[in-house]
């Protein structure tokens, strides 16, 4: 018969659950039940706590298996099926859950107290150490014994956050799920200490080079958890921050629009990749340079979010409205309605108005028909480019009706939607010019040209079956096919916009 469990701050038993490969809710290990519950759990309810949330989570038990309430807890904490979780027994049926895995949306902070007792600290564990945890066969060892194997991790975590005990500092763990969902959860203590636990507003993330990204501060309606969304992925990408990194922010401005400043700290760089990420940030200072992706041989131009190529959609002339992609507007600081100026290559200006769609992070340009027509964009499917000359309030956009002209006049490379057609057209023109020049040279030298050798009578007899008639028919067939393709693309684009709008409405309801 096992001794009864006596909770103490220095020796608390816990068990570890590896969620990878499990298709059902987790189960409390049998060995833990025998050692600490005399072989049988009498209660049908348990309480879960975590450092990521201030509330207690009620979870029902079906024998030893987690039942009702576990799904709400896992969704709120962004738990995935490849995570490794520690359940510390705090007495009775209360368990404190800590992440050893990859998907918790907040990092666990070291306590602001300077106590020498390591057991009072909330430790940060690295993703690359998860495999070592999973190989531990003893599921009911003391937390002290387990954490003694992580001394180096504790020291590293203490270094990362020893200066973050100030209430104005926020430490965040960049996880794959946070990048995938494009949001970052805000630690409840930080939000409450700085008056952000009940607010919904815009919030700026500022990097070391004073460049800002505007995100939206929102709250989960079920749990009250604060999070920032819409721009987190872009911020990490532009600053060379990868999944598994630790970022530290300082609240440098509160008020209507708070500002979080990224602290210059090596903790924002994954271990082993610090030099590579540092090079990326240095390269990003040079406009037009390219960042080489770590896991891909392709290069991504830094100015890719300044210029976009569009095809004119049927709804534009019908509604006199043109929708700007949400990511394009957000990444260029277009976050509020107001006046917008559109320029063409000749410097002619058109004043228009940006309207925000209520409840969404999307804008449309009202009264855009005039500058489209004036710049030769008149038919459905006509390509044109928009370049952001100045973002933020009262933005200035430059329109060009031809992709080729935009690339040559501004010095920016623009993606061509029909590379084969645009590449072959100049070649065909050159070949035609060469043939014309050769014929002209032969005629000037006195030699017989093809037209002088031909009999006009024979040409008139063959006219009904001339090549020009076939060319016209082929050309018309190509035009008809191209029109059908463009119409189909337009319909797909409308459906895509509807689906994006639906996703944004779901996000607005707090279903993250």
UniProtKB/Swiss-Prot annotation:
<keyword id="KW-0677">Repeat</keyword>
<keyword id="KW-0539">Nucleus</keyword>
<feature type="compositionally biased region" description="Acidic residues">
    <location>
        <begin position="115"/>
        <end position="145"/>
    </location>
</feature>
<dbReference type="InterPro" id="IPR039218">
    <property type="entry name" value="REM_fam"/>
</dbReference>
<dbReference type="GO" id="GO:0003677">
    <property type="term" value="F:DNA binding"/>
</dbReference>
<feature type="compositionally biased region" description="Basic and acidic residues">
    <location>
        <begin position="432"/>
        <end position="442"/>
    </location>
</feature>
<keyword id="KW-0805">Transcription regulation</keyword>
<keyword id="KW-0238">DNA-binding</keyword>
<feature type="DNA-binding region" description="TF-B3 3">
    <location>
        <begin position="307"/>
        <end position="403"/>
    </location>
</feature>
<dbReference type="InterPro" id="IPR003340">
    <property type="entry name" value="B3_DNA-bd"/>
</dbReference>
<feature type="DNA-binding region" description="TF-B3 2">
    <location>
        <begin position="169"/>
        <end position="265"/>
    </location>
</feature>
<dbReference type="InterPro" id="IPR015300">
    <property type="entry name" value="DNA-bd_pseudobarrel_sf"/>
</dbReference>
<feature type="compositionally biased region" description="Basic and acidic residues">
    <location>
        <begin position="410"/>
        <end position="421"/>
    </location>
</feature>
<keyword id="KW-0804">Transcription</keyword>
<dbReference type="Pfam" id="PF02362">
    <property type="entry name" value="B3"/>
</dbReference>
<feature type="region of interest" description="Disordered">
    <location>
        <begin position="111"/>
        <end position="145"/>
    </location>
</feature>
<feature type="region of interest" description="Disordered">
    <location>
        <begin position="408"/>
        <end position="465"/>
    </location>
</feature>
<dbReference type="GO" id="GO:0005634">
    <property type="term" value="C:nucleus"/>
</dbReference>
<protein>
    <recommendedName>
        <fullName>Putative B3 domain-containing protein REM4</fullName>
    </recommendedName>
</protein>
<feature type="DNA-binding region" description="TF-B3 1">
    <location>
        <begin position="11"/>
        <end position="103"/>
    </location>
</feature>
